[in-house]
Every structure is written in C-alpha cells, then in structure tokens.
Amino acid sequence: QSGLEIYPNPDLKPESGWSTEIGIKQGIKFGNWMGYLDVAAFLMQYDDMMEFTFGQWGGSNKPLGGVGFKSVNVGKTQISGIEISLSGQGKINDNVTINILAGYTYMNPISLSPNDPYAYQIQWGDTVSEYTYNNSSSDSTVLKYRYQHIAKIDAEIVYKKLSIGTSFRYNDFMRNIDY
C-alpha cells in the first residue's frame, strides 16, 4: 500500500448550526440591456464543525509512520460575508444577443474557539500532543482550506443559432492549511 492513509474517527460528532441571510434583488434596464442586481449578507455559526485534518493519526508502525488525514470536530466556528451578483442580457441587433452573469463573494470564516483542544495526536515515540486551531494552522485567523474572495464571470454571445461563451473564476490565496 502506498500514499496517505485516511484514518477513522469514532469520536466524531455531528456538526450543528444555524444561518441567516438578508438581501435585495433589483431589476435593472439600460437601453437594450436588462437584468438583475442581487446583493446579500450572510452569517452562519456551527458547533462541532467537521474538518478534514492532516497529521500523524496512526501509530509509528503504520504506513508512512501513521501520517494521513482524519475528520475531526474543530469546535465553534462562524462564517460571515457578502455576495453580489449581476445577470443581464443585451440585444445588439435582431441576430446578436449577449448574456452575462457575474458574481463576487467575500467570506470571513473564523474559529470562535482557536485555543480549545479539538484532537489529540500520536507523535513519534508514542507521545500525545494537543491540536488547537492556533497550533495546527498556517494562519489561524481563518478556517482551513477556504478562500475569502471569489469572483466569477460568464459571458455568452449568441448569433442566430450559434453561441460561444467564456468563463472566468478567481479564487484568492488560500491562507490557512494544515502544517
């Protein structure tokens, strides 16, 4: 067997939480263009949020010394942010139509309990150490493996029955990973 192991977690608890969102959707028209602008703010909070975490979860007698991934509960977390989207269609003439869909999302995914131990890891020599968000993260100010800024644009030009389109997606730098 080769590669990293996926280790079970019999102590894994289900995550629970709540969310709320408020927004506005407005129709817009400029000349031959019409569409919608949608702006929303959101807030989510989780208890016992689950995260796939890298570490030495098996004993030193396991393949790769017990290094691999395991799902763990990381405690109380919060994700807040805003979403803005714009969709529209414009007629250039009787034969040509342009469709556009654009969006931007800002998220602030944080741990509300960064110093609380959420897992215990077997180290080399069978010693045990605590995992907290602060001591297991490359940047403990945001949740692991999440982007804070995401933007996307889809555009399509339709000429009679022929269409051609393009898509662009931007994800900012992923600031926090296991280390």
Segments from the language model and where they lie:
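Gram-negative outer-membrane beta-barrel transporters
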Residues: N32, Y36, A40-Q45, V67-D178
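Outer-membrane beta-barrel translocator/channel fold
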Residues: Q1-I6, D11-P14
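Flexible glycine-rich, low-complexity coil/linker segments exposed to the extracellular/periplasmic environment
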Residues: S2-L4, F54-V67, V128-S136
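Membrane-embedded beta-barrel scaffold of Gram-negative outer-membrane proteins
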Residues: K13-G68, Q78-S80
